[in-house]
Amino acid sequence: MDDIKNLIEDLLGGDTVFNNTKILNPEYIPSNLPHRENQIKEMTVSFRDLILNPGSSSIRLVIIGRTGTGKSVTTKKFGLKLREIAHERNLRLEYVHVNCHRQRTLYLILQEISQGLRLQLPNRGLSSQETFRIIYDYLEKRNIHLVITLDEFDYFVSTAPLEDIYFLVRVYDELNVTTKRLHYIFIVREITSLSGLDKSIKDHIIKNIIDFPPYKSTELYDILADRVYNEKAFKENSVSEDVLRFIAEVHGFDKGGSGNARISIETLELAGKIADSENSPIVTLEHAKKANSKINPELSALIDSIKELDLHQLIFLKALVLLHDQEGIDFFPIGKIEQRYVELSKNFGEEPRRHTQIFEYVRRMKLMGLINTRQSGRGMRGRTTLVSLPIPISMEFKDLINTEIRKRLEQSRIS
């Protein structure tokens, strides 16, 4: 008897709590975007001239926010609806969304824009300038306006040569055309990723900024409820409000979570899969708890690593957490963290360690997986080490750091 085959057959042919898992996919664009109405209003105001007075100006818009705050899905939805409204007004408008983390070079970005326009390029290798000229001529001949969203633009800024950034942002304006057909939306996690750019580039980009704050627990609940009850991701009555409330409370920014809608939806989907694996007709609170522990397995490993740190390593980590909480961005220059570390050390009555020792702390904690580091990139002034945390900061994470600091201080006073 083939037990393995029977096991697989049973699961494949068994009942499921899901109705349509596509609705839980990160790339899915829902009908509604709860708690992003204000951002859509701001985007509409920024692009009003494109619809009412097309060609009068080239619009630039920057969208900032942490991972999972709805930046990409809201921008995609806005771009598609703006295109629909323009067509109803007999205005030829196209929208292209480019992920700069996937399309990592200027050449690949221009190729993606061409594909988004369904534009056939010659088989021979083209330079970026030649590709841009073909795109521009295509828009001119067909009287088309184009909105380009450059998602994860901060990644492009940190890796691309300065001349490529300049080309992408400024070349169209240097053509000195009368009718402005190109418009840009830049999506970044933090505005500081642009602040070190050359002034001629930075001033051109940072004009209109729209902030996407982390979601509160009540907002996450509404998002999850929309996917379950309105979009019908799950079968009727298979997911209770208590399950949604639990996930929202765990991840809500006001409750010490990350405010990340993507992780919340992933947790809900995994809870459903666990229910299916147990042949349960409903998703229970226990399924949600199991899913939550699996979604963030790094936390348990980090807890063990944190307990191995000495006092000053813990103070440095606390400095990073405090900066993250206060400024709401992911990466900080090592010098800025060191300044906060010095302040905290003095508050604890400790003599701060020297600069070289701080670098050694960063090196060791990176090897332990407690922090991530990267260089500021060629598009920035100078080069410095940027430091971030590898997981969303929870109250459990903060409490553990504070507890371990207290233990080290007590031990040092006893000895």
UniProtKB/Swiss-Prot annotation:
SUPFAM superfamilies: P-loop containing nucleoside triphosphate hydrolases, Winged helix' DNA-binding domain
Protein's GO biological process: DNA replication
Entry's transmembrane regions: none
Residues annotated for ATP binding in this entry: 69-73, 215, 227
InterPro entries referenced in this protein's UniProt entry, alphabetically: AAA_22, Cdc6_C, Cdc6_lid, ORC1/CDC6, Orc1/Cdc6_arc, P-loop_NTPase, WH-like_DNA-bd_sf, WH_DNA-bd_sf
GO molecular function annotations of the record: ATP binding; ATP hydrolysis activity
Pfam families hit by this protein: AAA_22, Cdc6_C, Cdc6_lid
Keyword Ribonucleoprotein attached: no
Keywords: ATP-binding, DNA replication, Nucleotide-binding
The keyword Nucleotide-binding is assigned to this record: yes
Protein family (similarity comment): Belongs to the CDC6/cdc18 family.
Record's function text: Involved in regulation of DNA replication.
Protein name from the UniProt record: ORC1-type DNA replication protein 2
Native species: Sulfolobus acidocaldarius (strain ATCC 33909 / DSM 639 / JCM 8929 / NBRC 15157 / NCIMB 11770)
Originating gene: cdc6-2
